Amino acid sequence: MLLPWLILIPFIGGFLCWQTERFGVKVPRWIALITMGLTLALSLQLWLQGGYSLTQSAGIPQWQSEFDMPWIPRFGISIHLAIDGLSLLMVVLTGLLGVLAVLCSWKEIEKYQGFFHLNLMWILGGVIGVFLAIDMFLFFFFWEMMLVPMYFLIALWGHKASDGKTRITAATKFFIYTQASGLVMLIAILALVFVHYNATGVWTFNYEELLNTPMSSGVEYLLMLGFFIAFAVKMPVVPLHGWLPDAHSQAPTAGSVDLAGILLKTAAYGLLRFSLPLFPNASAEFAPIAMWLGVIGIFYGAWMAFAQTDIKRLIAYTSVSHMGFVLIAIYTGSQLAYQGAVIQMIAHGLSAAGLFILCGQLYERIHTRDMRMMGGLWSKMKWLPALSLFFAVATLGMPGTGNFVGEFMILFGSFQVVPVITVISTFGLVFASVYSLAMLHRAYFGKAKSQIASQELPGMSLRELFMILLLVVLLVLLGFYPQPILDTSHSAIGNIQQWFVNSVTTTRP
């Protein structure tokens, strides 16, 4: 019975934030913080109940906790929520980054506090819904629902980019890309339900029943592409990434933390949970193309990151590069690579959130994100440059951080399946060190390039230090002791891999 509350608490909290703004600007902040704290506590409570590492019978999805209530029975639509090790880890990550998103916008957001927190809470509620929904209609409902508040977050509270583009442009671009891709997925979901109805005479949107839908290989390939396009836009996969750099560079800090830390993960989760098990043969056929797209993403993201002058755009392109590794892992069919992908998703969520929070703190002090205006900042403020150095080396996959474990497991698992692609993508790690260190050098070393950068700047407050040090501790912990994550995700990931590999060997009619 905890599952519906994981989704309801952020929605109710967001509504309260909006309505209590009249009692003072601090009230919505505290309500939002308590709301996300409660959501995180509930998800940790579910984790502590355990049972996630039990072995499962292959090919049958088994959930640790489930909630099912009829919604539109005539079409077989129900409010069907379920959690296993994979979705649990994503929900915990959402809760944690939700708390940090509220904290990092404590001083940054000054206008429409209540409405800001309404949008922030509803994005997080929608994301948790995506991770828990097992009814395809409900999944699509939450998938679309998290887009509208994100649009408002960028359009109303965004910053003007250093290249002069406006926040409205960025928000509209984000909305058009994601709406168009969502429409493609809706068509694919409806077509899948219709194919199932033709075969069985039963209308259903239930994921477990749709898993065994008999269909021809041509139909399966088309439907798989519908799902893949929707997830590829959100992930983002080159060449469908056009919305990401603009959305990141114009979004407020909380928006960037949510985008990089959580929203991109919904796409990787969608591929693992829906795309592979529903269309295993088509996915296996499409795998080489998807992996090469991942390789292109790794190099394109790295080169574009190196060329940026806006520090937030640089970090946005690093996300394109890192998610390329995850895409390669998803299509290998190797359990080791899958577990690496889960660790990489969590580590990237933490390290990207850290970098964006530090960017926000830097922007509050010098009021620019243009690295051509920085330089020489290392000696001008306490803590912030040194912590930026930590997150930069975490991003390039330094041993001892979670990013290294994730990338190593992905490359190790993929090498057995696609050695050529693995060897080529390894060079992407070299480029990662180039753009990470270039960012540090341009911003913190050398001579001060403007009046702003040459004056003494205030150090970090306790709130700012707490957020960043929490992320540092978690990343190092993940780097040295990833076992709890591996144990939790093991059976869920093993199940997806079994389904994918077994179905490929015993092809459909």
UniProtKB/Swiss-Prot annotation:
Membrane topology classification: Multi-pass membrane protein
EC number: 7.1.1.-
Entry's Gene Ontology molecular function annotations: NADH dehydrogenase (ubiquinone) activity; ubiquinone binding
Periplasmic side: 51-82, 143-173, 243-258, 307-313, 361-382, 425, 486-509
Quaternary structure annotation from Swiss-Prot or TrEMBL: Composed of 13 different subunits. Subunits NuoA, H, J, K, L, M, N constitute the membrane sector of the complex.
Classification via PANTHER family: NADH-UBIQUINONE OXIDOREDUCTASE CHAIN 4
Protein name, as recorded: NADH-quinone oxidoreductase subunit M
UniProt gene name: nuoM
